[in-house]
Amino acid sequence: MHTACESELLQLITTYDEKDFEYLRKCARDTADRIFGNKIYIRGLIEFSSICKNDCYYCGLRRSNSNAVRYRLTKDEILSCCQNGHELGFRTFVLQGGEDGFFTDDVMCGIVSEIKNRFPDCAVTLSLGERSYESYQRLFDSGADRYLLRHETADKKHYSMLHPPEMSLENRMQCLYNLKRIGYQTGAGFMVGSPFQTPEMLVKDLKFIEKLNPEMCGIGPFVPHKDTKFKNENHGDVSLVLMLLSIIRLLKPNILLPATTALGTVDPLGREKGILHGANVVMPNLSPVKHRKDYSLYDNKICTGDEAAQCIGCLADRMKKIGCEIVTDRGDYTEE
């Protein structure tokens, strides 16, 4: 594992040139190859609710967006997505949704336990936002294996510029530490290029990842949504995202690191580039086709048509072209 002080990280992300960029890319990919071989883990993403109580300023699903199309999948629909995914070879299902009050602990625990009962060889990852310690514990006891909760920014002032007053960075971080304590494989992460972000803030994000020591980290470029206050902002810089992926791989060699949908949205080859810079996870969409375009976190999101998870052969070909292969095992986090 590599380590770097804040001043070294700041210098790296503010002054890197093409030579530094390529050197870090090669080191990161070599590190991933040493630990995982050329394996890329696939996770089946099920976006089960576009209803959210929160009003995050950057998100297309924010409560106050009256143009958003709202839906929620039934338990049977979620299980059907899992069945389709299992037949396609997926062994991890990622259940992601807005903070929708319909999905109480009783409802979610019933869904999780049924997935584990029907598909005992599969891992269940949840991404349901901020919940109580007791809620996280119940979901874990029902069979959930992993939990994704991006912190978005580790700078308190910056967090307040991206979220309404009722949300706090302290609570977000406490949730992450609670998840770790309970025993989840825990995922944090942040946007790159979000409004008001500075290089110093990105360094804070990297140091927080070092401190939290999550099993997973999801980063991607900020992508504006037309129905938010940041609609006229530019999207995050792809090169900087790739640079940060490489740095995270070197700081945390064993981490599960996705090449995110947002990266593929901003750059047609974004996911391949992410893999070449140290990522080792991709998350195709298993959601019902009729709802994919409605889970609109940001504009122009890819994977909204028939091609998403069904085109598993296409994804395999794309990975093969860069010397990697997709694998269908659970892909759990392990220490060296």
PLM regions: where:
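Auxiliary Fe-S-binding modules of radical SAM enzymes
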Residues: 1-19, 86, 210-336
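An N-cap/entry alpha-helix motif that binds or orients negatively charged groups
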Residues: 3-41
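Conserved, mostly hydrophobic/aromatic
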Residues: 28, 56, 95, 149, ...
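Canonical Radical SAM [4Fe-4S] cluster-binding loop centered on the CxxxCxxC motif
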Residues: 30, 36-77
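Glycine-rich, proline-tolerant flexible connector loops at the mouths of alpha/beta enzymes
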Residues: 43-46, 66, 94-105, 157, ...
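Active-site-proximal loop/turn and secondary-structure-junction residues that shape catalytic pockets
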Residues: 46-48, 99-101, 128-132, 153-155, ...
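Core AdoMet radical
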Residues: 63-77, 85-106, 112, 116-176, ...
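Catalytic cores of alpha/beta
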Residues: 132-139, 195-209, 264-276
